């Protein structure tokens, strides 16, 4: 099973996979699973034009652990086997989260690409580790209390304006809230295990309220926002990957203290000074990759741009998409 943000899934020894866009709509008297043994532990019915979960007769699969019904026409969550640990309903027509009361062993739930407006009826799923709501119509982060085993939460592509109500997610490691309407970094105080924050394509204008993540945050993706300065980023002393592409940043000030930085993605900003690259970044001995393409310093010096960056930062292994050979002293 896969999702928008992760390649992880399960591969049980016994499973059924049907992926056929030409399969006709399933009616109550027309069950694709009639010939499937009762003891399978994984069923995948993808692009099968299924409209009703009830018509599948899933109750006879007493050992079913993983159910994937991606890219169908399901409007209602129902008849969910209580033995499930993974449920994938990505890309259906679901408008409401319901009928999960008895599915208490779920560790993975994907409801991405549906029509859900409100997060509800899931805080009893105490074992959830991965939860996905990509591309729905959700306006508010709420009703997640009790999900203290959750490590990965994906809320990208919704209508969320505020990061809130995450205090009980004390084991959260990855938070994805890209492509929303968020204007501010806030309410991270309780997320003491957060190592990755993706907040791309929002309305962020400054780095703020991040000191509480200084010891844990390793990856920060904040491209396509309204940032004009790195001020406030200096508190993230353990940051390893920083993506600020497609903002309006003019200077590299405040980066000199990020001693653990390995990758800096800063394409399509307003950076113009090679001297700043040397002054601010030459002390970052772990820095291996930089992206400066699309900045004035590249557009006004296209022929010598990469060589000048390499002279400023001889430790680099990659400039933009170009890998630097270990024996190379300059670009051709």
Curated annotation (Swiss-Prot):
Post-translational modification: Phosphorylated.
Function description: Essential for the mitotic metaphase/anaphase transition. Positively modulates protein phosphatase-1, possibly by forming a repeating helical rod that is capable of enhancing a PP1-dependent dephosphorylation activity.
Entries under InterPro entries matching the protein: Cilia_flagella_integrity (IPR050576), Leu-rich_rpt (IPR001611), Leu-rich_rpt_4 (IPR025875), Leu-rich_rpt_typical-subtyp (IPR003591), LRR_dom_sf (IPR032675), U2A'_phosphoprotein32A_C (IPR003603)
Single Gene Ontology BP annotation: positive regulation of mitotic sister chromatid separation
Keywords: Cell cycle, Cell division, Leucine-rich repeat, Mitosis, Nucleus, Phosphoprotein, Repeat
GO terms, molecular function: protein phosphatase activator activity; protein phosphatase regulator activity
TM helices/strands, residue ranges: none
Taxonomic path: Eukaryota, Fungi, Dikarya, Ascomycota, Taphrinomycotina
Any one GO cellular component localisation term in the record: nucleus
Pfam entry (one): LRR_9
Complex and partners: Physically interacts with the dis2 and sds21 phosphatases.
Localisation per UniProt entry: Nucleus
SUPFAM superfamilies per UniProt: L domain-like
Domain LRRCT, first and last residues per copy: 295-332
Record family assignment: Belongs to the SDS22 family.
UniProt-listed PANTHER family: PROTEIN PHOSPHATASE 1 REGULATORY SUBUNIT 7, PROTEIN PHOSPHATASE 1 REGULATORY SUBUNIT SDS22-RELATED
UniProt keyword annotation of Nucleus present: yes
LRR repeats: 63-82, 83-104, 105-126, 127-148, 149-170, 171-192, 193-214, 216-237, 238-259, 260-281
Protein name: Protein phosphatase 1 regulatory subunit SDS22
Superkingdom field: Eukaryota
